[in-house]
């Protein structure tokens, strides 16, 4: 019984860590399915307010996306900064530390697809 409580609290702590990351980004899930085996695929709309950033973080799987509105800079550790505008897309390898910062005076709105290891938090903040 105690083990189940400790496990539950540990899972809740990881979930809260992901929520803390969300201070600069709002994710609205559109679909979440357990596919392929051992992974969860999440399709979401993500929005970052003007002047904001997502905060440095990682995902336990790949992220791909498409810019709907606004502009921003995508910084992936070890790669040149990529400026994104409506119609642009990107791919981020599993575990890569990255951040997105809005440029201009409009919010950045994207559609993102995450294929992450099942039962792991969608995002984990890093310093």
Residue ranges of predicted features:
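Sec/Tat-exported extracytoplasmic proteins
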Residues: 52, 68-71, 76, 114-117
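His/acidic/aromatic-lined binding-pocket segments of jelly-roll/cupin-type domains
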Residues: 56-58, 62-67, 82, 89-90
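Short acidic-glycine-tyrosine-enriched beta hairpin
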Residues: 48-49, 72, 78-95
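Extracytoplasmic
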Residues: 41-43, 59-62, 79, 95, ...
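Soluble periplasmic/extracytoplasmic beta-strand elements of cell-envelope proteins
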Residues: 43, 47, 73, 111-114
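A short, N-terminal "cap"/entry segment at the start of jelly-roll beta-barrel domains
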Residues: 2-45, 75, 83, 91, ...
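Ligand-binding loop in jelly-roll beta-barrel domains
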Residues: 95-119
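Short, conserved beta-strand element in jelly-roll/cupin
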Residues: 47-48, 60-74
């Amino acid at each position: 019984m105690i083990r189940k409580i400790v496990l539950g609290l540990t899972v809740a702590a990881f979930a809260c860590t992901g929520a803390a990351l969300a201070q600069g980004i709002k994710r609205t899930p559109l679909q979440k399915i357990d596919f392929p085996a051992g992974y969860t695929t999440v399709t979401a709309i993500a929005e970052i307010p003007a002047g904001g950033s997502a905060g440095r973080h990682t995902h336990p799987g790949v992220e791909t996306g498409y810019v709907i509105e606004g502009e921003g800079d995508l910084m992936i550790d070890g790669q040149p900064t990529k400026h994104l505008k409506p119609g642009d897309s990107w791919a981020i390898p599993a575990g890569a530390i990255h951040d997105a910062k809005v440029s201009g005076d409009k919010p950045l709105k994207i559609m993102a697809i995450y294929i992450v290891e099942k039962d792991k938090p969608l995002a984990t903040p890093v310093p």
